From Swiss-Prot:
Task performed by this protein: May play a role in chaperone-mediated protein folding.
Subunit-level organization: Component of the PAQosome complex which is responsible for the biogenesis of several protein complexes and which consists of R2TP complex members RUVBL1, RUVBL2, RPAP3 and PIH1D1, URI complex members PFDN2, PFDN6, PDRG1, UXT and URI1 as well as ASDURF, POLR2E and DNAAF10/WDR92.
Subcellular localization: Cytoplasm
Protein name per its UniProtKB record: p53 and DNA damage-regulated protein 1
A GO term, aspect molecular function: unfolded protein binding
Keyword Cell membrane: no
Domain of life: Eukaryota
Entry keywords, A to Z: Chaperone, Cytoplasm
Entry similarity comment: Belongs to the prefoldin subunit beta family.
GO cellular component, one term: RPAP3/R2TP/prefoldin-like complex
GO biological process, any: protein folding
Amino acid sequence: MVSPEADRVLRYLVEVEELAEAVLSDKRQIVDLDTKRNQNREGLRALQKDPSVSEDVMVCFGNMFIKMPHLKTKEMIQKDQEHLDKEIERLRSQLKVKVNRLLEAQGKPELKGFNLNPLNQDELKALQVILKG
C-alpha cells in the first residue's frame, strides 16, 4: 500500500504535468497558427505585386492546386488572416490564465506585468495628444 505522503506527491506531480502540458500545447498551437498567418501574408504580398488582376491565380489547398479568380483569392486570404488573428489572440489570453494556474500549483508567485495589453489606436492617439500639450 502507498503511503499518504507518496500519494499526495504523486497527485501534485500529475496536476503540474497536466497544467504544463496544456501550456505547451497552447504555445505549439500559437506557433503553428502564426506560421500559417505568415504564409498567408506572403501570399497576399505576391497577389499585390501581381499586375494581372483580371487573370486567375493558382492557389494551393493542402496538396491540391486550384485556379481561382484573383480578387476572390485575395478576399479569402484576408478573411483567413482575420480568423487567424482572432484565434491567436484567444489562445494568448488563455495561455496567460494557464501559466498563472501552473505557477500557482507550483507555489510560485504570479508573473508581474504578464497581464498587460497593448494600447489600441484610440488610446495611443489620446496619449499622444496628452503628451504634446
